[in-house]
Structure formats: structure tokens, C-alpha cells
Amino acid sequence: FQTKPGISVVVGGCIDPDIIVKDEGSYPLAASILRSGAYFKFVQENNDQYASIDEVLADNELMTKFKVFIEENDISGYVDGQEDLKLAKEKLSKKEEKNLFINNAFSVIEKQIEKTQSTMFEDEKEIIQRMVHGEFAFYYNGYEGRYNIYLKDDKVVQKAIEIFADESQYLS
């Protein structure tokens, strides 16, 4: 079935999207930072170092400062199995407190989780930086400033702008 302009309607009555923008994926560290309120806290602790959002955007050391901040505040992303490990360690530690093999096994696993979390920052750096910039933009310029930062890199918004710039695409 098709609508009058020729758009295909799939089973269930939904219209197929003309354009599909790939999902950016999940960001466990960025989400943990957001849930903890750390973006806001970082801005509150550091806003006196900058006179405007332009100074923030020009600071090449900003992400290094933010990484130190989240490490000092013990903010980490969720790694699959992390909670299960914590529960298992609590249960086994009580029973097998002096078992060197179990303690070493937990130590190895915990080091792997720490390694995974440190790579999370690098993997998610772009989205974390966007969030830090957005929070500073909100501090200096309110919601308009925040959305100007967030939307300039948003893939869906960028695709829409691209389509609207080409009249032949959005009128077809």
C-alpha cells in the first residue's frame, strides 16, 4: 500500500522513514556522569576560570581537567558484569576470606574493569566533551546556548539541514 504521494506503508499502518540515521549507540560513562550530576558540578567548580563559552571552547586542556575531575570524584561507567562481580565478591569474601586464589582472581577481574573504564573515557570522549560544553553553554547563555552546542553535532539535525538545503530532496 502507498499513500497518495507514493510513500510506502508497511504492515501495521506505519510509514517507512525516507531516511534512516544510524543510532549513535550507548555511552555508559557519559550516562553515569550525567546521572551523578558531575557535568553540572564541574561547571560550578570551574566557571570562574572562563569569561564566556568561547573561552571554554578554546580551552585545549578542558577534557584533561574533566577526566581528573571524574577520577577524583570516583565517577565511573557501568561495565557488564560489574554488579554481579561485586555481589559475588561480597558473598565469597565472607566465606573464603583467606583464600589466596579467590582474592587474586577478584583482583585480576577488578583490574580489567578499571582498564575497561579508562578506555571508556577515550571511546566516549566526543559525547562527553559535547555534554561538558553544553553545560558551560547553559551556564553562560541558558537553554539557547546549550541547544546550539548540542544540535550542531546532532546527526539527525545535520541530516535534516542537509535535506532542506537541497530542495529536490525534500520535495520528492
Tell me what each language-model feature is.
Residues 1-172:
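Conserved functional hotspot residues or short segments at active or partner-binding sites
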